[in-house]
């Protein structure tokens, strides 16, 4: 028997260009289970219980799983951990999405599936978590340790005696891989995998042979040493030089602005970014995938910068600035609206988690974003010109005209009512599609959460992610905005939400197809079979648990449904199907779709 350890090279910083792979996360470990003694009982001194204790130690109290014959014994031992709850999902893809949503709230998530048929099913969700810099522990129940190297063919494989197909697939979307088929090194591999996920803020893969979880071993008889992750520190000389150069660059600008990007999460730099905004007085914007990371009630907040589809008057201020500092940006074809942003490199300071680049000039490595922003705040001159310009040109958006009592509901009216539902005790999850653009216009109250998956953009993500986020934050009311096409991809785990007693509100926007794809490139393949969605959810409910549904076609019905969901059914899972016209799309989606389509349609370069 041998133990294979995958490379962690994928985590090493290799590309610091704009839009390059994110890296550099530093995580704090929370020990949620006080240790009352240094030893554990012999029946608990097993590999399975050791893994369970380690998950609890880092703050994971819920694991999302799908049972299979290779992971059943492992699941028994995870269930036996009193501080760990096993959440059975309807399929592996949703289990992975749930772990993704959980990690967005708790800081780390975990899922357990079976060998190959489960592993390859969850792979898409793991890839999404990798792209979004989320630490996620993907655990797979693997073949019996005696079968390695025997040239045997096993079920749940592609019919070859080589068992590494699954491992090779995961190597591309995880930062560390451990195949545990002997007990001697199991604790070391588990600890290395978990600590690597936390350090790199990326998913890891752990495969455990199905005959090992129940075996006692003296190694597991003592409580493990708590995780102590080394804190990354900036190179002081580089930090000082970067701050001096950036301060000189910004202090001579007339109307500089700040723009927050999604990598602020992995850099844990949101507070430092706000500190810089307070000190500078600059207009403060966020990229779309950073919405929710910066308080929108900040006095200098000017909205979402998304090129041609920015919130009102934000693009005018950002693109007319003579200097802009981007903290943790990702410039891909989606966030750049088909590479159409009107930005100039010579005007930009790009701050990545561990690197600062100033205009066309110097780049400073080994400089942590959090340290850089905090030190820069001490050196920057106050200049509120960009915010004053925004305030001068800003015209408040008019409220949508009230619908006639029996008129078909308009999408902008729907989101006006969703806006009124938001509070510090709520969170919004936006599915890929027109909800991206409508939710960007929501003004988040202080403390209101917000999540969506922009880099990977996998339709259907929000169903599983809503399950995981709500499980991690039971005291928040999660509001999910999901299109009908996306819902059909992953709808089954509404069942799990009801079974777990979650009080989520899902707005199912029924417009008869894949609207976002229609605006990129239309065709008959974007038309879907209409479901009776409320009847579908009622069938899943089947009289067990708290569930309430409504189908609304006009504003009057919507108001009544929201009132019910937020009052007498506030402790229930609520599903509101909103029927709108298929052509009722946001102008932002129309603009964005045409530009992304143009980028996709570029002819080949001449050879």
Swiss-Prot record:
Cofactor (UniProt): a metal cation; thiamine diphosphate
Gene Ontology MF term list: magnesium ion binding; pyruvate decarboxylase activity; thiamine pyrophosphate binding
Annotated EC: 4.1.1.1
Name of the protein: Pyruvate decarboxylase 2
GO cellular component term of the entry, any: cytosol
Domain of life per record: Eukaryota
Family from the record: Belongs to the TPP enzyme family.
Amino acids binding Mg(2+): 484, 511, 513
């Amino acid at each position: 028997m041998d133990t294979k350890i995958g490379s962690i090279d994928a985590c090493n910083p290799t590309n610091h260009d704009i839009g390059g792979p994110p890296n550099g996360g530093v995580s704090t470990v929370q020990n949620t289970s006080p240790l009352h003694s240094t030893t554990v009982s012999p029946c608990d001194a097993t590999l399975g219980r050791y893994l369970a204790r380690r998950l609890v130690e880092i703050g994971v109290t819920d694991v999302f799983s799908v049972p299979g014959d290779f992971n059943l014994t492992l699941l028994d031992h995870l269930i036996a951990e009193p501080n760990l709850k096993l959440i059975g999902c309807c399929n592996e893809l949703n289990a992975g999405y749930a772990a993704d949503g959980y990690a967005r709230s708790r800081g780390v998530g975990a899922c357990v599936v079976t060998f190959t048929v489960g592993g390859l099913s969850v792979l898409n969700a793991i890839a999404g978590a990798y792209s979004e810099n989320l630490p996620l522990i993907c655990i797979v129940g693997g073949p019996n340790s005696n079968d390695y190297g025997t040239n045997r063919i096993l079920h749940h494989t592609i019919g070859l005696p080589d068992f590494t197909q699954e491992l090779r697939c995961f190597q591309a979307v995880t930062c560390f891989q451990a195949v545990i088929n002997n007990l001697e090194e199991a604790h070391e591999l588990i600890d290395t995998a978990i600590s690597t996920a936390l350090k790199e803020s990326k998913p890891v893969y752990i495969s455990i042979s199905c005959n090992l979880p129940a075996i006692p071993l003296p190694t597991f008889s003592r409580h493990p040493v708590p995780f102590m992750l080394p804190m990354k520190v900036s190179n002081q000389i580089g930090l000082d030089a970067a701050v001096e150069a950036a301060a000189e660059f910004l202090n001579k600008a007339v109307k500089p602005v700040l723009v927050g990007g999604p990598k602020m999460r992995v850099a844990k730099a949101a507070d430092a970014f706000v500190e810089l905004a307070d000190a500078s007085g600059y207009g403060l914007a966020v990229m779309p995938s950073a919405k929710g990371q910066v308080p929108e009630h900040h006095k200098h907040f000017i909205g979402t910068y998304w090129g041609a589809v920015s919130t009102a008057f934000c693009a005018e201020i950002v693109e007319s600035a003579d200097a802009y500092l981007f903290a943790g940006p990702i410039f891909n074809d989606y966030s750049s609206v088909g590479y159409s942003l009107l930005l100039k490199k010579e005007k930009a300071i790009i701050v990545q988690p561990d690197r600062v680049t100033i205009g066309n000039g110097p780049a400073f490595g080994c400089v942590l974003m959090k340290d850089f922003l905090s030190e820069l705040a001490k050196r920057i001159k106050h200049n509120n010109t960009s915010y004053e310009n925004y305030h001068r040109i800003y015209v408040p958006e008019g409220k949508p005209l009230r619908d006639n009592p029996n008129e078909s509901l308009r999408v902008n009216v729907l989101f006006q009512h969703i806006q009124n539902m938001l509070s510090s005790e709520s969170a919004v999850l936006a599915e890929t599609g027109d909800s991206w653009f409508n939710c960007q216009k929501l003004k988040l109250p202080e403390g209101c959460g917000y999540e969506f998956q922009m880099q990977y953009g996998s339709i259907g993500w929000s169903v599983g992610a809503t399950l995981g986020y709500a499980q991690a934050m039971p005291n928040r009311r999660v509001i999910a905005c999901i299109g009908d096409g996306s819902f059909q991809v992953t709808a089954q785990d509404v069942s799990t939400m009801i079974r777990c007693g979650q009080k989520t509100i899902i707005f199912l926007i029924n417009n008869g197809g894949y609207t976002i794809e229609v605006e990129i490139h239309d065709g008959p393949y974007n038309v879907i079979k209409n479901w009776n969605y409320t009847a579908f959810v009622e069938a899943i409910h089947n009289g067990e648990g708290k569930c309430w549904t409504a189908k609304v076609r006009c504003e009057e019905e919507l108001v009544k449904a929201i009132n019910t969901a937020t009052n007498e059914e506030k402790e229930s899972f609520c599903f509101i199907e909103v029927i709108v016209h298929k052509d009722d799309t946001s102008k932002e989606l129309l603009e964005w779709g045409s530009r992304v389509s143009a980028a996709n349609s570029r002819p080949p370069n001449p050879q």
